[in-house]
Amino acid sequence: MLIRVLPGDPILSIVPETATEEDIERTRIRYGLDRPIFIQYFDYMSGVFRGDFGTSIQTNRAVVEQIRERLPRTLELVLYGFIFSLLLSIFLGFLSAYKAGKMSDHFSRFVVLVGNSLPDFWFALVLILIFFGLLDWAPPPIGRIESDIGLELFTGFLTLDALISGNWRALGSALSHLALPVLTLGIVGAAPMMRSVRASALEVMGSPAYHCANAHGINSKELFWKYLFRESLVPLPVLAGLIFGNLIGGSVLVEYVFSWQGFGQWALRGLLLRDYPVIQAFVLVTAGFYVIIFLIADIVQAFLDPRIRY
């Protein structure tokens, strides 16, 4: 509802300049925008329960079809970015805790500072300038794969589809196009998780139980994996779930910079053009992902911390 109180009429962006008032009104009736907003809301929600998210005002295509087309592109990017972010934050968090006050600690905290301070779209532009413009190590930031490579789509995840079909050239091209946007999302997302891992690890290392286990001469590897690692990761699942959800919504500008043509870029275009069905679908799908993500986070939390029972 909130998007509809903003200035601007989506109908005016699709009718020709020569359209009369009658033409505009007929188009408005065609998309159901002439009815009271509460009736529009209940009609839309009844359609959602049937799997119908409406028709895009701008493209006149079913929104569900566009979601199927665009969502896998964003999920592939966000999933790889999240995995890289999670691994980076765990590695730097424990490294910083073990080397507290030393050069490694300062370097890890500098990475956190950079990740917290830089806007993701600006960081993406810097990476493009360095790795594509100056070093020529990365492909042009246009799309997900080279235009002259053919690939049959099964899942919408280009890397997975390339593996299924055994198209190694397509796999290499897809990975090279993923490198910079994944690096962008990974570093930005790793900052808060790394800080959480570091703080938890320092707390565990300072606990009497850890000192007692260390004093009993337990092997350093066993001490790390059975005591420090698991206990330090207890607070991480909820924060990681929040970061994953933020990456889905926050990938909009990164997709725009890299011409990714994903779910986020599709939603941004819908927002700029006041395409109500597109915006509403983006909000609902994103909210649904948050519910699923936090459900998974709660399950992982219960596995890491036996004190939690549901």
Feature-to-residue mapping (PLM):
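Hydrophobic alpha-helical transmembrane segments of membrane transport/permease proteins
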Residues: 1-42, 131-170
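An internal, D/E-rich "acidic patch" concept
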Residues: 12, 34-90
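Alpha-helical transmembrane segments and their helix-entry boundary regions
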Residues: 13, 36, 105, 121, ...
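Hydrophobic alpha-helical segments of integral membrane proteins
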Residues: 23, 27, 37-53, 63, ...
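Alpha-helical transmembrane segments of integral membrane proteins
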Residues: 71-104, 150-310
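Cytoplasmic-entry segments and transmembrane alpha-helices of multi-pass inner-membrane transporters
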Residues: 91-127
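Hydrophobic alpha-helical membrane-insertion segments
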Residues: 115-137, 239-244
